[in-house]
UniProtKB/Swiss-Prot annotation:
It is found in: Secreted. SMART domains: PD. GO terms for molecular function: growth factor activity. PANTHER family: GASTROINTESTINAL GROWTH FACTOR XP4-RELATED (PTHR13826:SF22), INTESTINAL TREFOIL FACTOR-RELATED (PTHR13826). Transmembrane segments: none annotated. Residues 1-17 form the signal peptide. This is Putative gastrointestinal growth factor xP4. Disulfide bonds join C27-C53, C37-C52, C47-C64, C75-C102, C86-C101, C96-C113, C125-C152, C136-C151, C146-C163, C175-C201, C185-C200, C195-C212. Glycans are attached at N104.
Amino acid sequence: MANSVFWAIAVALVLGAEAYMPLDYRCGVKPKSRDNCGPPGISPDECVKKGCCFDDSDPDSIWCYTPWKFEDTICNPAEPKARVNCGYPGITSQDCDKKGCCFNDTIPNVVWCYQPIIEAVERDCSAVEPKKRVNCGPPGVSPDECIKNGCCFNSDVGGVPWCFKPEIKKELLQCAVLPKARINCGYPDITMDQCYKKGCCYDSSESDSIWCFYPDIEDVTIIE
């Protein structure tokens, strides 16, 4: 969630309130779901240079962690009432598409230009039991070399590979999260831009709800 990460932003206007979703929220990983991407004490700059995300707002979580890897965007017109607006009144399909959003005007009385679901791939190191680790590097491989090759590194357990293959999960992420189900990703008075830089979703259409929140994992499929 560092400032040097570039973002593609999808902008929407809902009844005069701000409601936005960053299409590239690769660092929007919930604290409890993070996989370590650097050694203890790594600086924000060093973390980002490694292609990782850095966020130290939660003292009990991993600060330098592996980002989401995006595969595709998905438009799902099967749930029209759950659509999250991504345009303005009268927006054309061409302008909607340029924003990285979905357009479907076949159903009346619902949003036509709406935010897509993001298909991402997650490398989950914590899901691999030590006895089930599959070696992913040569003897003596360094933590940096191991991680750079897309593998996991953990030297806490003896007699098992320290550099090993992660569990690969395909997940669907979205910002269409009900207010009561949102997990806070910000702090009081956080701005829209500050929220985006943290890789999170922003929706200020309801004054008494969390405005800056983590994208929701809709579906998980283990592919490797």
